Amino acid sequence: MSRSLKKGPFVADHLLKKVEKLNAQNDKKVITTWSRASTIVPVMIGHTIAVHNGREHIPVFVTDQMVGHKLGEFAPTRTFRGHKNSDKKAKR
């Protein structure tokens, strides 16, 4: 179930303030955040936001196609090291 339209998208206040401050200064610094649940809004387009994945901050450059998605979608939390290699040939 998606969020109610009358509530609007969730964006952390501190993150929105940082983005608006950089927009007012026409500055493009990397914004560090732990708020993976924040929705990407059109104000963020063109900024690089470093999203925490539990271990480090992953830089995410926001484009217009990302609007409406969550920041956490672009910073994977699990490292995939590949499937187990079967040794069927070695057992013969």
Swiss-Prot record:
Stated family: Belongs to the universal ribosomal protein uS19 family.
UniProt-listed PANTHER family: RIBOSOMAL PROTEIN S19P FAMILY MEMBER (PTHR11880), SMALL RIBOSOMAL SUBUNIT PROTEIN US19M (PTHR11880:SF8)
GO cellular component: chloroplast; mitochondrial small ribosomal subunit
HAMAP family xrefs: Ribosomal_uS19 (MF_00531)
Pfam families: Ribosomal_S19 (PF00203)
Role: Protein S19 forms a complex with S13 that binds strongly to the 16S ribosomal RNA.
Compartment(s) of residence: Plastid, Chloroplast
Annotated protein name in UniProt: Small ribosomal subunit protein uS19c
BP term (GO), one: ribosomal small subunit assembly
PROSITE patterns (UniProt xref): RIBOSOMAL_S19
Name of the gene: rps19
Organism this protein belongs to: Oltmannsiellopsis viridis
Gene3D superfamilies recorded: 30s Ribosomal Protein S19, Chain A
Molecular-function annotations in GO: rRNA binding; structural constituent of ribosome
InterPro entries per record: Ribosomal_uS19, Ribosomal_uS19_bac-type, Ribosomal_uS19_CS, Ribosomal_uS19_SF
Keyword rRNA-binding in record: yes
This protein's UniProt keywords: Chloroplast, Plastid, Ribonucleoprotein, Ribosomal protein, RNA-binding, rRNA-binding
